[in-house]
Amino acid sequence: KELGINALHIKLRATGGNKTKTPGPGAQSALRALARSGMKIGRIEDVTPIPTDSTPRKGGRRGRRL
């Protein structure tokens, strides 16, 4: 705010690829903190990379065995 910035467009990004596609717990609280500090939030955009032809996920053919 002291820099003269009073409005934001937010790009939200998770790990993506062949890992998790949901943002972590800090994303929502960071967004809420920005809104509470008086920033005007214009647009929230999800820019998580989504695979088109992914490498196999870790865990192997039979998955994670507990």
Swiss-Prot record:
Annotated stretches, region: Disordered: 46-66
Matches recorded under Gene3D superfamilies: Ribosomal protein S11
Alphabetized SUPFAM superfamilies for the sequence: Translational machinery components
GO CC aspect terms: ribonucleoprotein complex; ribosome
InterPro entries membership: Ribosomal_uS11, Ribosomal_uS11_CS, Ribosomal_uS11_sf
PROSITE patterns tied to this protein: RIBOSOMAL_S11
Domain of life: Eukaryota
Protein name: Small ribosomal subunit protein uS11
